[in-house]
Amino acid sequence: MEISGSIQASLGGRYALALFEVAQEKGQIDTVAASLGKFDEAFAQARELRLLANNQIFSRKHVEKAIAALVPVLAIDDLTAKFLNLLAAKGRLGAFPEIASAYRQYVADLRSEKVADVITAHPLSDEQKSTLTARLKEQLKADVQINATVDPSILGGMIVRLGSRQIDGSIRSKLHMLAQAMKG
């Protein structure tokens, strides 16, 4: 498997690579990916969790306790739970989204898949994800893994990033272009 140097060079990439290698060694790549997905979704949706992860007011022990409480609720596997505790203990939980994204990229590289980062104003339904995956697969002529994130600031529509390519169909972008056109 060829690992992208730019991913590996980042802090999140190094943590993701370490987790990926252990998961691969233990035959738990998919289990860890599923658990990271659950935590990533919780991280994206729970403002309090993001604040806790990025806040220097709470001690690392408090963050570790919060993670320990979330693990059974989200049904996170043991390896991922230990990894999340490590991030909390090292004060690196704020880097989780980058780590999860890099891990997904390692999995995609292993499987010769393409990863599409999709940003929407509201969470995509399973049906919408399936439709988008099928259309991207048809266009790219390769298996595609969707990395969906929610950013209400785009107002509507979606932004799709595939490697260095980006398709911005967000309402925010369209309003910005309209405002620029009106300015002359």
Curated annotation (Swiss-Prot):
**What is the purpose of this protein?**
F(1)F(0) ATP synthase produces ATP from ADP in the presence of a proton or sodium gradient. F-type ATPases consist of two structural domains, F(1) containing the extramembraneous catalytic core and F(0) containing the membrane proton channel, linked together by a central stalk and a peripheral stalk. During catalysis, ATP synthesis in the catalytic domain of F(1) is coupled via a rotary mechanism of the central stalk subunits to proton translocation. This protein is part of the stalk that links CF(0) to CF(1). It either transmits conformational changes from CF(0) to CF(1) or is implicated in proton conduction.
Identify the main location: membrane
GO MF terms listed in the record are: proton-transporting ATP synthase activity, rotational mechanism
- UniProt keyword terms in alphabetical order: ATP synthesis, Cell inner membrane, Cell membrane, CF(1), Hydrogen ion transport, Ion transport, Membrane, Transport
Task: Tell me which SUPFAM superfamilies the record gives.
Answer: N-terminal domain of the delta subunit of the F1F0-ATP synthase
Keyword check for Ion transport, yes or no.
Answer: yes
Q: Where in the cell is it found?
A: Cell inner membrane
**Pfam families, alphabetized:** OSCP
PANTHER family recorded for this chain?
ATP SYNTHASE DELTA CHAIN
Please give the organism.
Answer: Zymomonas mobilis subsp. mobilis (strain ATCC 31821 / ZM4 / CP4)
Under which name does UniProt file this protein? ATP synthase subunit delta
Hey, which family's this protein in? Belongs to the ATPase delta chain family.
Superkingdom, taxonomy of origin: Bacteria
Q: Which HAMAP family did the record assign?
A: ATP_synth_delta_bact
Q: Which GO terms describe its cellular component?
A: plasma membrane; proton-transporting ATP synthase complex
Assembly and interactions?
A: F-type ATPases have 2 components, F(1) - the catalytic core - and F(0) - the membrane proton channel. F(1) has five subunits: alpha(3), beta(3), gamma(1), delta(1), epsilon(1). F(0) has three main subunits: a(1), b(2) and c(10-14). The alpha and beta chains form an alternating ring which encloses part of the gamma chain. F(1) is attached to F(0) by a central stalk formed by the gamma and epsilon chains, while a peripheral stalk is formed by the delta and b chains.
In what way does this protein cross or attach to the membrane?
Peripheral membrane protein
